[in-house]
Amino acid sequence: MNMKKKLAAALALALPALGLFGCMQNRDPSVNWRLSDSKANLPKLPQRLEIGKNGVPTLSVYDVSDKKTSDMDIERYVMGVVAGEMKNDWPMEALKAQAILARTFVLKFCQDKQSKYEGADISTDVAEAQAYVPNSVNARVRQAVDETRGMALSWQGDYPNAWFHAHSGGMTELPSVALEYKGGDPQYLKPAPSGESKRAPEDVKAWTATFTKAQVAKACADAGTRVGAVETVELGEKGESGRAITILVNGKAVSAPSFRIQIGANRLKSTLIESVAVDGDAVTFKGRGFGHGVGLSQWGAYQMAEEGRTAQQILQKYFPGVGIVELW
């Protein structure tokens, strides 16, 4: 039986048990999950994924920690991702929102991309995909994944880009600005205010990062712009959220997102840079937030969950107009 026939057979067995794509078995009845109302609107499962006996697609995952590839169903993979991307004691609805995003991310990845690790559908390499920390899975993470089993975001019959970051600094941003995304800014991702939790670490809410001039010059070159010996550093063009699109080094425009990656994204925590100063050999940046600023803010999700919002409400804030569907 070829792949398409296997997929069709598995779906034929699984979907009737769920009702017409809409029966949320074991779901919280107080949550009004927004579902696609027709088969035509459901995203298709990636063709290269096999369907397991439990009706859940199976992944080949390359683990960079032990350099081995193993097969697991998507639900098990999602548990490890949720535990890697959020602390396992976070509010339940924030964990659920992260689970739905993690599931959407891996399905879109398997649909559109190929892992750089031969024989794998995806890896635990954060440069390629998502953080994966199975040792941090606890009862809360399992509950969040179980209660959102098979659920993913859907946009016009496809998987949307399920971007997320740690802390928006107060406002999210367009992918074209914060990520240099060339695919066009999706309708479901617009700059929007994001109320961040006061429990976020102080060095995430506001931070300072100091580099040598040589480090700045090398990062500029690695980002594609040679600037020579650094004399001046200024902020250039900005997006709606205030994030830098360019940084002017010796008057030359350098891509701010690329510069951040090259100089160290864990030190220059975002491109929401409020000031830059040159003092002797030191170049000091001050800014807010952590991460690229596109899509869901994890500390914003934390705050919404603390306020009593559901996972659905959290996702609809950060991805307005996007639906949630149950695929298995």
Where are these regions (language model features)?
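Extended substrate/cofactor- or partner-recognition/assembly subdomains adjacent to catalytic sites
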Residues: T104, K108-A282
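Post-signal peptide N-terminal segment of secreted/secretory-pathway proteins
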Residues: M24, E85-K116
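Soluble non-cytosolic domains of exported or imported proteins
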Residues: K68-M72, D89-I100, T210-F211, G291-G295, ...
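Solvent-exposed, polar/charged alpha-helical surfaces in well-ordered, non-transmembrane soluble domains
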Residues: R76-G80, E93, A97-I100, T104, ...
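N-terminal, intrinsically disordered, polar/charged segments of Gram-positive cell-envelope systems
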Residues: N26-Y62
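C-terminal soluble interaction/assembly domains
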Residues: S255-W328
